[in-house]
């Protein structure tokens, strides 16, 4: 019986391989997905930016927080997940569907959802650490405040084409910053549980 159990455990571990760790691993496929999401956002461009310049706004992207080295492992994973979740929520709306090419929008939402699923393996163990909950909340609240400002802006501009174009460019900045964070996490051994 012990031999059969050992054999089954070995098969499970082998089947996961280096790209499908039981822990928290951002594979090369995850990074390719992040780059593809940026390309999709670039392809969603429908307007020349010139008529929309007067609608520009500084939304206060917490770029230093995301791209810098100030986040600890649990904070970085939580911030990355929150940014992707908020971006998904932004584009997975009725207003967004009316503004963009449906095929590109669906591909973007699918890509964001896949990245979120990849990160869920990382977020589970982190969320169980009660003593660091307060340390994660500050950065997460900063991300939520950033996206709340974006939602308010869209509503104030009545979801105009120019407003969506400004947001598309802003989301390219945000996803580019989150990609930088993902690369930093991956360089630290690839396995986020080892950070």
UniProtKB/Swiss-Prot annotation:
Name this protein carries in UniProt: Interferon tau-1
Impact after mutating residue 169 to M: In IFN-tau1C and IFN-tau1D
InterPro entries documented for this protein: 4_helix_cytokine-like_core, Interferon_alpha/beta/delta
Record Pfam families: Interferon
Family matches, as SUPFAM superfamilies: 4-helical cytokines
Alphabetized CDD domains for the sequence: IFab (cd00095)
GO aspect biological process, one term: positive regulation of biosynthetic process
Note: IFN-tau genes are intronless. They evolved from IFN-omega genes in the ruminantia suborder and have continued to duplicate independently in different lineages of the ruminantia. They code for proteins very similar in sequence but with different biological potency and pattern of expression.
Disulfide bonds: 24-122, 52-162
Residues bearing glycans: 101
Family: Belongs to the alpha/beta interferon family. IFN-alphaII subfamily.
Tissue expression profile of the protein: Constitutively and exclusively expressed in the mononuclear cells of the extraembryonic trophectoderm.
Keywords: Antiviral defense, Cytokine, Disulfide bond, Glycoprotein, Hormone, Pregnancy, Secreted, Signal
This protein's record includes keyword Disulfide bond: yes
Function: Paracrine hormone primarily responsible for maternal recognition of pregnancy. Interacts with endometrial receptors, probably type I interferon receptors, and blocks estrogen receptor expression, preventing the estrogen-induced increase in oxytocin receptor expression in the endometrium. This results in the suppression of the pulsatile endometrial release of the luteolytic hormone prostaglandin F2-alpha, hindering the regression of the corpus luteum (luteolysis) and therefore a return to ovarian cyclicity.
Source organism (scientific name): Bos taurus (Bovine)
Domain of life: Eukaryota
Compartments, as annotated in UniProt: Secreted
Gene: IFNT1
Signal peptide interval: 1-23
């Amino acid at each position: 019986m012990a031999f059969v159990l050992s054999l089954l455990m070995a098969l499970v571990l082998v089947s996961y391989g280096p790209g499908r760790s039981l822990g928290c691993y951002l594979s090369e496929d995850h990074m390719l997905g992040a780059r593809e999401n940026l390309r999709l956002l670039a392809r969603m461009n429908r307007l020349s930016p010139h008529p929309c310049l007067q609608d520009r706004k500084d939304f206060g992207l917490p770029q230093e927080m995301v791209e810098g080295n100030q986040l600890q492992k649990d904070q970085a994973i939580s911030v990355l997940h929150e940014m992707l979740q908020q971006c998904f929520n932004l584009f997975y709306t009725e207003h967004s569907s009316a503004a963009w090419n449906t095929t590109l929008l669906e591909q973007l939402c699918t890509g964001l959802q896949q990245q979120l699923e990849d990160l869920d393996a990382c977020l589970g163990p982190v969320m169980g650490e009660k003593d660091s909950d307060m340390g994660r909340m500050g950065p997460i609240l900063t991300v939520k405040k950033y996206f709340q400002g974006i939602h308010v802006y869209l509503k104030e501009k009545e979801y105009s084409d120019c407003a969506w174009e400004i947001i598309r460019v802003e989301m390219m900045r945000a996803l580019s910053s989150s990609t930088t964070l993902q690369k930093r996490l991956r360089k630290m051994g690839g396995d986020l549980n080892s950070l």
